[in-house]
Amino acid sequence: MNIKNQDQDLLQIKMNIVRSKVSFKRLKDKELSQWQKIPTSIAGDSMNRQNVMSSRISSIREGMTLCGQARTVSVTHGDNSAIHAALTIINKGEILVVEGGGFTDRAVWGELMSLSSIHIGLGGVVIDGAIRDLGDLKKMNLPLFASGRTAAGPTKGGGGRIDIPISCGNVSLKPGDIIIGDDDGVAVIPFEIQNQILLSSEEKIIYEKEIIKKIKDGNTHKDIFDIKDIPIVNDDNLSLIHI
């Protein structure tokens, strides 16, 4: 049996893949475009420094950005059967988010899946697991964020679940939540508080622009942030200094 036929046979194994019924409001392009202007760092600050994925998940090259609503997949260790299945139902512009447990000893994503995703019009992919074919993936116009890379391929037939609440990069999310990503990482905005977080993020951007202007105008760090004089204490009488 050659490798190609072996792979096809593995995919034909009856897999225990479960898809949950999901219903969420699809945001219009105009609504999503507002989030394209929000950096992940600002969104995270607006959520009390929460809902930003672990730094182990990063883009495969600089300049990649994500903005779209999540479709979720949970896979078993090193198995990508459920991802293959998800690619048959996901819609244009959506972000595929994969709960892979952070395992990086087997790649669950590679060149072929990326090519299919581009054909679908996927908005991007976030994987808490490993990828491979990195050289080819970097040349593609598909935003891809992952927690590792390896030449070792995936297993098949291990099953998985689609369109369920998952944890990716230590952040809980569900289908329909807004996913944004950039060079700093990936942030998750729960759908039900998106308007509140968007407003807060826009206000923070304005605030930071004002701070930048003050710095460029020559104002000192002390004056800008109203930092009090730091008391000098003897080494034998050290105490906690409150700024």
Residue ranges, per PLM feature:
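Conserved small/polar residues in nucleotide/adenosyl-binding loops
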Residues: I241-I243
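Extracellular/luminal Protease-associated
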Residues: A86-G129
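Intrinsically disordered, low-complexity regions enriched in acidic/Ser/Thr/Pro/Gln residues
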Residues: N2-T76, Y207-H221, D226-I230
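Histidine/lysine/aspartate-rich catalytic loop segments that bind and position anionic ligands
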Residues: R132-R149
